[in-house]
Amino acid sequence: VVGDGYSSKRHNARISVNTEVYDRLKLTGQMSYVDFYKKDLGYSGTSGVFRLSQRMSPLLPVMWQIPDENGRMVDSENWSYGSVRNPLQVAYESGMEERKTRVLNGIFNADLKIIDGLNVGMQYSANIYTRQVDEFNPKMLSYYSDGSPLKANEDAKDYISQSHLDVMTQTLQFTLNFNKTIGRHELGALLGFSQEWENRSTLGATRDNVMVEDIHVISAGMINFMNSGTKDEWALRSYFGRVNYAFDGKYLFEANLRADGTSRFAKGNRWGYFPSFSAGWNFSREKFMEFATSVLSSGKLRASWGELGNQNIPGNYYP
């Protein structure tokens, strides 16, 4: 990056707590916070400069020398991409982009032992993400290698923009877990419920013809007011269960069933039901494999079948 003032800063904080209450209740919690600041070039930042460098013809001079010995930056005309802006001009003459990002994560768990082999669990997690981007770019004039100006100079302008993004994602889950061993039989079962939801909002504004280049506030722009804003939210609710059985650690079976309901689909089409099954054979524990224990510590064959849903459609598809 060319010039002074370009920088990035990052601050991290993390805390973790674990405790047990009366040997039956376990509580854990973790929180983390990230504060990231970056000051970069305008016009897509340094990545834009690198992309332009790859597209610029190596046969063109960097500058076109005019009689007064002041150099004008040279742009190229490429039939594949159209006019390609001089990357050195972007590095020297473009404005600034300031990006501030804050992320707060938290997860809390509680596990209660009711009786031997029967536990109730609860988990809550939250992710809060905010990002603010302020950008200012002055008017940039461009010329071909023969000194003639690009037609784009007629529309060249300075502009200022600001954007803000807020996202909050939360998850709540409850489980009931059962495990029991009777002789050579191992039984297990799980029942659960989960709820996940997300709220997202954006706000942006752009102005042209900035009065004073040193004042980078949105109200400094005089013409071409453009404002935008969005809000969307979605939620996913799930019920799930699992049973598993093992005999003598050799023969294994597991069955799962889950029901998922999403707000991203229309009423009457929001719920889906998804089963899965698996069976396994731990052949390394059979007597006829005892001769190979020195070279094969574990050998297992497993077959499974299952279905899963997919709610990954654009957030504004429905409703």
Q: Where does each model-flagged region fall?
A:
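Transmembrane beta-strand segments that form the barrel wall of outer-membrane beta-barrel proteins
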Residues: 1, 253-262
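Solvent-exposed loop/turn segments connecting transmembrane beta-strands
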Residues: 3-5, 263-268
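Hydrophobic, lipid-facing positions within transmembrane beta-strands of outer-membrane proteins
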Residues: 11-15, 104-108, 168-174, 237-243, ...
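Conserved helix-loop functional segments at active or binding sites
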Residues: 249-250, 279, 285-286
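His/Asp/Glu-rich mid-to-C-terminal helical/loop segments that flank catalytic regions of hydrolases
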Residues: 110-114
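Surface-exposed loop/interface segments of Gram-negative outer-membrane beta-barrel transport/assembly proteins
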Residues: 2-6, 16-103, 121-237, 285-319
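Conserved short loop/turn motifs at secondary-structure junctions
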Residues: 31-35, 259-264
